């Protein structure tokens, strides 16, 4: 490694073009949408006369549409260009977040969240490729920046949701719509027009990429991991028995640790243990946290502690998995990312609804226990497919 490379690696993360920061800002707002509704779930359930499983569909519709559309986002981007794909995604989010705030029934709100998910799919998958493409310091630096935006968005989302939700459950939806409009203006002016790829991405290229065992192993394990992730995120507000402010602060702490470990701790752990060993250890830790939450569900302080501590684990998992996926198959990074993200989000889509049904038909602790078991199975998938991941280098 020459001195120039060393300097770029040291300064690249923060010394980025304005276009990168514009996209990163929009990423923060976009990821706010994941945790934004967390503190207002009980309020929505009460005011729209919905059960926990019905309210959980706000996550399910959002994530299901996001996951499904991510299979095709690369094909869309290669035809209309990355910048216009970002802009189109932002417009969808602005419109459907605003419509969500004006909903009069849970069915309407669930439908509008699905439309929000469509915009999210177009934006998120393209944003990662754009940040990697226009940033300085290499792909590993860009991925860390992207995961930091993810963590910051997820942490600020509940805080904003709690503060605005104390005014009305509708306020967070209108708030995101306004912030995304600001992001739209920033990207329109700061992001230069990016050249379209020489070769168009096929409509089904992302699906076809899953034939590679390394990528398939990562995708399936992420599907199972994200099931546990969204059990924690979407179900916990109903267990904690806190108001909007309290829920906002708890999940702000969770997201803050997630953001910190995704940027600072994950690269160190990845380098020290390698891809498979680091993920196996972290999956076991997350599964154990969920099982503990299942055993002592009635202990509010313990549940809060487990949620916040889990953020540290999840931040490392997110960065290590996203980095590893880029080298898990002999396809373009954008295609690998789309395939992986699609399967990952679909796993997350199932968890909230299943958690609600389990709690209604069994006990309040059942969703956590089931989530822990599913994450443990995800760890077994990694172990069984480890030979297909042997070529992935830390910090790829």
From Swiss-Prot:
<dbReference type="InterPro" id="IPR020846">
    <property type="entry name" value="MFS_dom"/>
</dbReference>
<keyword id="KW-1003">Cell membrane</keyword>
<feature type="transmembrane region" description="Helical">
    <location>
        <begin position="56"/>
        <end position="76"/>
    </location>
</feature>
<keyword id="KW-0812">Transmembrane</keyword>
<feature type="transmembrane region" description="Helical">
    <location>
        <begin position="278"/>
        <end position="298"/>
    </location>
</feature>
<comment type="function">
    <text>Acts to efflux copper or a copper complex. It is possible that YfmO could contribute to copper resistance.</text>
</comment>
<comment type="similarity">
    <text>Belongs to the major facilitator superfamily.</text>
</comment>
<protein>
    <recommendedName>
        <fullName>Multidrug efflux protein YfmO</fullName>
    </recommendedName>
</protein>
<dbReference type="InterPro" id="IPR036259">
    <property type="entry name" value="MFS_trans_sf"/>
</dbReference>
<dbReference type="Pfam" id="PF07690">
    <property type="entry name" value="MFS_1"/>
</dbReference>
<keyword id="KW-0187">Copper transport</keyword>
<keyword id="KW-0186">Copper</keyword>
<keyword id="KW-1133">Transmembrane helix</keyword>
<keyword id="KW-0406">Ion transport</keyword>
<dbReference type="GO" id="GO:0005886">
    <property type="term" value="C:plasma membrane"/>
</dbReference>
<feature type="transmembrane region" description="Helical">
    <location>
        <begin position="214"/>
        <end position="234"/>
    </location>
</feature>
<feature type="transmembrane region" description="Helical">
    <location>
        <begin position="142"/>
        <end position="162"/>
    </location>
</feature>
<feature type="transmembrane region" description="Helical">
    <location>
        <begin position="80"/>
        <end position="100"/>
    </location>
</feature>
<feature type="transmembrane region" description="Helical">
    <location>
        <begin position="20"/>
        <end position="40"/>
    </location>
</feature>
<keyword id="KW-0472">Membrane</keyword>
<dbReference type="InterPro" id="IPR053200">
    <property type="entry name" value="Copper_Efflux_MFS"/>
</dbReference>
<feature type="transmembrane region" description="Helical">
    <location>
        <begin position="171"/>
        <end position="191"/>
    </location>
</feature>
<dbReference type="GO" id="GO:0022857">
    <property type="term" value="F:transmembrane transporter activity"/>
</dbReference>
<dbReference type="InterPro" id="IPR011701">
    <property type="entry name" value="MFS"/>
</dbReference>
<dbReference type="GO" id="GO:0006825">
    <property type="term" value="P:copper ion transport"/>
</dbReference>
<feature type="transmembrane region" description="Helical">
    <location>
        <begin position="301"/>
        <end position="321"/>
    </location>
</feature>
<feature type="transmembrane region" description="Helical">
    <location>
        <begin position="249"/>
        <end position="269"/>
    </location>
</feature>
<feature type="transmembrane region" description="Helical">
    <location>
        <begin position="114"/>
        <end position="134"/>
    </location>
</feature>
<feature type="transmembrane region" description="Helical">
    <location>
        <begin position="339"/>
        <end position="359"/>
    </location>
</feature>
<keyword id="KW-0813">Transport</keyword>
<dbReference type="InterPro" id="IPR001958">
    <property type="entry name" value="Tet-R_TetA/multi-R_MdtG-like"/>
</dbReference>
<feature type="transmembrane region" description="Helical">
    <location>
        <begin position="364"/>
        <end position="384"/>
    </location>
</feature>
């Amino acid at each position: 490694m020459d001195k120039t490379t060393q300097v770029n690696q040291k300064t690249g993360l923060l010394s980025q073009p304005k276009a990168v920061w514009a996209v990163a800002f929009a990423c923060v707002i976009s990821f706010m949408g994941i945790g934004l509704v967390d503190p207002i779930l009980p309020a929505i359930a009460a005011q729209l006369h919905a059960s926990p499983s019905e309210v959980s569909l706000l996550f399910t519709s959002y994530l299901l549409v996001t996951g499904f559309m991510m299979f095709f986002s690369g094909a869309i981007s290669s035809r209309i260009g990355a910048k216009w794909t970002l802009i189109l995604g932002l417009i969808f989010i602005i419109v459907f977040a605003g419509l969500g705030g004006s909903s009069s029934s849970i069915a309407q709100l669930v439908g509008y969240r699905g439309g929000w998910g469509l915009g999210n799919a177009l934006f998120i998958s393209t944003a990662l490729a754009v940040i990697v493409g226009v940033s300085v310091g290499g792909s590993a630096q860009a991925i860390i920046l992207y995961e930091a935006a993810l963590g910051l968005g997820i942490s600020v989302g509940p805080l904003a949701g709690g503060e605005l939700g104390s005014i009305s459950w509708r306020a967070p939806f209108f708030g995101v719509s306004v912030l995304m409009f600001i992001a739209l203006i920033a990207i329109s002016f700061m992001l230069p027009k990016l050249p379209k790829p020489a070769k168009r991405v096929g409509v089904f290229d992302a699906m076809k990429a899953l034939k590679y065992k390394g990528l398939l192993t990562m995708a399936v394990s992420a599907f199972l991991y994200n099931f546990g992730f969204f059990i924690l995120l979407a179900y916990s507000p109903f267990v904690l028995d806190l108001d909007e402010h309290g829920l906002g602060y708890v999940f702000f702490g969770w997201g803050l640790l997630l953001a910190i470990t995704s940027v600072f701790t994950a690269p160190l752990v990845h380098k020290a243990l390698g891809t498979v060993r680091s993920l196996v250890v972290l999956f076991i830790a997350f599964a154990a946290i969920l099982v503990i939450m299942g055993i002592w569900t009635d202990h509010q302080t313990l549940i809060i502690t487990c949620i916040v501590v889990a953020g540290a684990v999840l931040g490392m998992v997110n960065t290590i998995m996203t980095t590893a996926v880029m080298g898990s198959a002999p396809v373009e990074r954008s295609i690998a990312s789309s395939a992986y993200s699609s399967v990952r989000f679909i796993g997350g889509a199932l968890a909230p609804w299943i958690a609600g049904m389990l709690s209604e038909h069994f006990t309040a602790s059942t969703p956590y226990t089931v989530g822990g078991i599913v994450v443990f199975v995800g760890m077994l998938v990694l172990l069984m497919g480890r030979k297909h991941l042997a070529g992935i280098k830390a910090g790829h």
